[in-house]
């Protein structure tokens, strides 16, 4: 069984729904054993961007890293196109939309850790990820304290 720490994020107007849908998709590919729930974060790379919603999932899966990465990136691309089409008459079909303004991320799905190996060091040290890990750590202490 493999264990993945997956970070979801969006700052689009329909971002909360996009994150909820992504959680359901991720759950189809294994068992979610921990979940921060959605939490707000400030944009780190473009101060003009709207606030983000993020969520970290811990997934146990039989899939290998290549397969999980491929299906999450395929889902991400499909949903970004759908959201961009719905929200922008100019159709931003890239990773994000940036039309005369701030960067808007429809949905971002990143496998940050895989079986204890850090795959995305920049995400691992980012405030949005550290905040989620802090939430997960708090959940662990509540569960342990209840025992």
Say what each PLM segment does.
Residues 1-5:
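Extreme N-terminal starter segment of soluble prokaryotic enzymes
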Residues 6-12, 16:
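Active-site microenvironments that recognize anionic phosphate/pyrophosphate groups
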Residues 8-10, 57-63, 113-116:
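Short beta-strand-to-loop capping motifs
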Residues 44-51, 66-69, 74-147:
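Flexible, gly/pro- and Lys/Arg-enriched active-site loops
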Residues 17-65:
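Short, surface-exposed acidic-centric catalytic microdomains
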